[in-house]
């Protein structure tokens, strides 16, 4: 069962909170506990969160993060605690001996994409592209043209969400766009599953998904919905290779959903449809994070 705005701070047992209260006097109600080396280091480096305290398991990790903070010229308290306490504040998730107490991510909400189709995109002269001010985050391919965004709708598993974000960042998407109501909360679990990509990537919420996608098509964006190629399907369904060739020079939004498929009202807003060949009546689809990797690799490269 998915709870709205899952917060690891609220999942911490009272016993653990009591112990940490003795050490820090107070844990803020809006605190989250970011865990894992990559997620913690990226959160500290980008400072998209208010970083409040580090909890480390041993002297070696203490020294590692003390040196890391010195390089960043950033000062926050580093508290040495035992593994049991780290297990408690992370609900026994794999934390690598380090946990960061921080505020939740402040994800902006947008109504449309500012980058119109056909506009020249070139950062070599030092000018920023209009769609780069969606967020203070980054992409791994800031100079790529045409741009590709990933719109996510209906992914309620935090591991899948993290894996999609990680693939999108590594494979060169410009950013992640999320519906507010139909996805898992961007929790520290998502951050860990993304190998810390959540902390650095361009990520925005979309105010009204149907209006957003419809307006994007009108502006010239090619909105590509993922859809199984069933025999009775009347829509033209592209393979990844064919849609790459067809839309090579067009700005794109790849729309991904759960394994149940995209909602009908989202599918109707898409300008194109793509399906990865394979499967049968027993297993007819890939995990969404695997599908995301295949499609992104094809579309970006």
Curated annotation (Swiss-Prot):
- Principal location: mitochondrion
- Transit peptide, residues from-to: 1-11
Please list the reactions this protein catalyses: a guanosine in 21S rRNA + S-adenosyl-L-methionine = a 2'-O-methylguanosine in 21S rRNA + S-adenosyl-L-homocysteine + H(+)
UniProt superkingdom: Eukaryota
Record region (Disordered): 121-141
The record ties this protein, via Gene3D superfamilies, to: 3.30.1330.30, 3.40.1280.10
The record, for SMART domains, names: SpoU_sub_bind (SM00967)
The terms under GO molecular function for this entry are: RNA binding; rRNA (guanine) methyltransferase activity; rRNA (guanine-N1-)-methyltransferase activity
What Enzyme Commission number does this protein have? 2.1.1.-
GO CC aspect terms: mitochondrial matrix; mitochondrion
Query: Which of UniProt's keywords are assigned here?
Result: Methyltransferase, Mitochondrion, rRNA processing, S-adenosyl-L-methionine, Transferase, Transit peptide
What role is this protein assigned?
S-adenosyl-L-methionine-dependent 2'-O-ribose methyltransferase that catalyzes the formation of the 2'-O-methylguanosine corresponding to position 2270 in S.cerevisiae 21S mitochondrial large subunit ribosomal RNA (mtLSU rRNA), a universally conserved modification in the peptidyl transferase domain of the mtLSU rRNA.
Query: Member of which family?
Result: Belongs to the class IV-like SAM-binding methyltransferase superfamily. RNA methyltransferase TrmH family.
The protein here is known as: rRNA methyltransferase 1, mitochondrial
Q: Which gene encodes it?
A: mrm1
